[in-house]
């Protein structure tokens, strides 16, 4: 439902509730069969109308549950302020922050991290993703080559609806191990990413060794580098914008997708930009989909980044390659991609 709202509006237009109203909604929520009208659910994006799926409803106590075919229940007696939004009169949804916590508790912390990264980025997936309700969409596939996954898995350009700081503040008042574990991962979230593959790349290079990442963060995304006179003369540009800039390493990490980079004009622009950055003493590495699936190559790139930071690359995690591959495939699943 949240993805459907972002696709249709470009943002979330739902109404915030004050804490008293949130408690009242949770306390009095007790839906019956008569309250669940499929056309309305399809209209607001809570159901597709084409795929048989369970509807998950939140109530404040076990006594509020009802035996309804096709409905599963989640029970929570209390939620922090800012957990519930009003979709329309009588219909409510978890906020982006609360949804991330729910996914962390019910599915896993990395899956919740991936969802949080999507919500912090300028993308919204179609609902073919594994961890939110399915939704059939004819959107053109923008993720990779057509052979890599079905053509109806794609993404939409929208505005972010969450920030890492907002999520961290919310998690600070949440109870439970899942919330605390997700809170520890908030510093590794990035903002304003523009494609699912950028999200996967930044997660791999930012997350700690213990999760299967390369511990190269933090990165500044959409970072504007002003060129000096020499760099301007060489590149013909006043500045460059880096996808992911590691300031301590003076290192720019770029994802080179199929769109916008394969044309002659795109190649010339990238060459000028990269030459200008190199003139400024900034090393540039370009990663594509094939390279991102090669953990040995990515670890060599991470080693170079650590070297530029004047640090030793010390990944002493047992079976580290298996952890790295498991992290990659978990992230790919979250963004609707096949495992490698």
Positions of the model-derived regions?
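Short gly/ser-rich loop at a beta-strand->alpha-helix junction or flexible surface loop bordering the NTP-binding
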Residues: 1-178, 317, 327-340
């Amino acid at each position: 439902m949240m993805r459907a709202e972002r696709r249709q509006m470009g943002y979330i237009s739902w109404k915030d509730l004050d804490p008293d109203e949130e408690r009242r909604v949770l306390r009095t929520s007790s839906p019956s069969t008569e309250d669940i009208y499929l056309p309305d659910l399809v209209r607001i994006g809570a159901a597709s109308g084409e795929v048989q799926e369970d509807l998950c409803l939140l109530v404040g106590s076990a006594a509020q549950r009802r035996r309804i075919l096709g409905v599963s229940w989640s029970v929570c007696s209390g939620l922090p302020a800012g957990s519930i939004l009003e979709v329309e009169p009588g219909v409510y949804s978890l906020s982006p922050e609360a949804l991330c916590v729910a996914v962390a508790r019910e599915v896993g912390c990395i899956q919740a991290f991936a969802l949080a990264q999507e919500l912090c980025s300028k993308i919204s997936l179609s609902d073919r993703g594994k961890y939110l309700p399915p939704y059939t969409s004819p959107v053109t596939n923008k993720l990779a080559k057509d052979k890599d996954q079905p053509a109806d898995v794609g993404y939409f350009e929208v505005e972010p609806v969450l920030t890492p700081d907002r999520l961290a503040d919310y998690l600070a008042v949440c109870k439970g191990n899942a919330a605390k574990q997700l809170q520890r991962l908030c510093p590794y979230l990035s903002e304003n990413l523009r494609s699912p593959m950028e999200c996967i790349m930044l997660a791999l290079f930012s997350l700690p060794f213990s999760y299967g990442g390369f511990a190269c963060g933090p990165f500044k995304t959409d970072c504007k580098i002003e060129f000096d006179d020499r760099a301007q003369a060489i590149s013909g540009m006043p500045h460059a914008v880096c996808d992911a800039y590691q300031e301590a390493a003076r290192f720019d990490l770029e994802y080179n997708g199929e769109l916008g980079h394969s044309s002659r004009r795109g190649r010339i622009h990238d060459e000028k930009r990269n030459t200008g950055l190199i003139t400024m003493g900034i090393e540039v590495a370009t990663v594509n989909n094939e390279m991102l699936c090669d953990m040995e190559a990515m670890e060599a790139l991470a080693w170079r980044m650590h070297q530029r930071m004047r640090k030793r690359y010390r990944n002493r995690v047992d079976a580290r390659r298996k952890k790295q591959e498991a992290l990659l495939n978990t992230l790919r699943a979250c963004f609707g991609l096949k495992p490698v």
